[in-house]
């Protein structure tokens, strides 16, 4: 997991010089290829792009390099999958939407504690975070549009997305309430998770 130029903030797109990233990525692939030959390392050794999910701006250069070299890549998707679970619950409406709103309320109330361990990989403007009362009044569509990583949606809010990305502990503390709703809303949650991983990530990379 080499350190690349630019910022890899949690849950949002890459911020930096894409051309410089491409150069560094290709250089690292060359180093791995040489190391495999020189030191007998496993031939399937892969680069790990830490916090690489949702970094759509650099997927083109990564895809190009992988196709040209036959190399592999390890992309961590736990965080983006958690957010799609939350979007799926909001899409389901009813108790699912209420839980999603409750997660936001608790995350906002505990923002300092939740954000502190991730200070170097988030960039949240608190002035851009709606109040919990405002979010309580949102429709299912409003919640989804704010959170879903689609920059063509005018209401997409990267600050909300980053806060909820690091707010997974709120859902963990909910325990069975959260897990049971995931099961009850499995169809819509699975649809969102699958579309995100396959359409936005795998198809763009491979």
Language-model regions, residue ranges each:
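Active-site capping/gating regions of soluble enzymes
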Residues: 1-206
């Amino acid at each position: 997991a080499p350190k690349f130029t630019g910022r890899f903030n949690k849950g949002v797109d890459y911020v930096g010089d894409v051309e410089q990233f491409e150069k560094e990525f290709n250089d690292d692939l060359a180093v791995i290829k040489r190391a495999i030959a020189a030191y007998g390392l496993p031939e399937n050794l892969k680069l790990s792009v830490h916090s690489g999910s949702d970094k759509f701006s650099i997927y083109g250069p990564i895809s190009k390099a992988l196709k040209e070299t036959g190399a592999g890549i390890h992309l961590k998707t736990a965080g983006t999958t958690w957010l799609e679970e939350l979007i799926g619950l909001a899409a389901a409406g009813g108790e699912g939407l209420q839980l999603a709103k409750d997660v936001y309320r608790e995350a906002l109330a505990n923002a300092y504690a939740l954000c502190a361990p991730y200070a170097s990989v988030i960039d949240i403007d608190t002035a851009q975070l709606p109040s919990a009362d405002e979010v309580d009044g949102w429709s299912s569509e409003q919640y989804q549009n704010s959170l879903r990583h689609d920059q063509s949606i005018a209401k997409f809010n990267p600050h909300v997305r980053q806060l909820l990305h690091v707010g997974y502990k709120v859902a963990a503390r909910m325990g069975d309430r959260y897990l049971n709703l995931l099961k009850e809303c499995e169809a819509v949650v699975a649809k969102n998770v699958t579309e995100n991983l396959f359409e936005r990530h795998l198809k763009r990379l491979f």
